[in-house]
Amino acid sequence: MGVYKDFVFVSFNPQAQPLEDYLAGAKEYIDLIVEQSPSGRMEVIRGTQEYDIRANWKLLVENSFDDYHLMTTHSTWLNYMKRSGVEIKKPERGHLMPAHGVGKALGNGHAVIDNINFRGRPVAKWIPLYGEEAKPEIERIRAELVDRLGEARATRVADTNRNLVVFPNLVLNDGSSITIRTFHPLAADHMQVRAWALGPVEETSKARAIRLDSFLTFYGPGGFATPDDVEALESVQKGLATYREVPWSVMSRGMSKVEEQLNTDELHLRAFWLRWHELMAPTFEE
């Protein structure tokens, strides 16, 4: 067992490397989550989302930090945000939302997409959807961040979203809410998903209400996004099972680039699969 910033990790491998070595570059993104609390203490908020998906678990890994599908798969949610007064700007880099996004491999199979926030954050970016009555509270949280962390770090914490995959099956979505998601295979084409909301222990009832509303609106079996994703993954699984003459899932976006990878490229997806192959290939040879 190892603990990093109050995140507890357990391995059944007696020869597992030290946790901080294993987390590698993922530590930076866990730090950005924990720094949202003035005391550095976060709490799992009461309540669990639990549902099954009839698809291979690794498809949900891909989905969890794939920004390429956002504009088409979640168009209903984007239209809802626009009607609610949220400004959705045309990307300045690439051709898809969000603007300014990058994808990064973080070592040991961990990877992340990191992009500019447009959908609001309880810590601490106000949007019209929150209502005018929430603006003073968000501004207070923002001021505390700047005072504690400095302007540059506060901007990094409050104005960017991050979807982090800690290999193999832990997802930390740090956006309009913070979601802890994990999933376990029940069969080659069936997984069980569990998710929880995370928030600062000091959070006021007003900020907590915004957080939970954002969490339920986007994520979960009744949200705007998760039903879209479940339908997509189950359709992909059916297709892969039916068309066996197509042996590969192409994941080559950005492969020839030498410059920084966009969030809509697939470097971060390939990082996961390279580590998976590294661990699994000896088994196949045996």
Provide a role label for each language-model segment.
Residues 2-286:
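C-terminal catalytic domain of Rieske-type non-heme iron oxygenases
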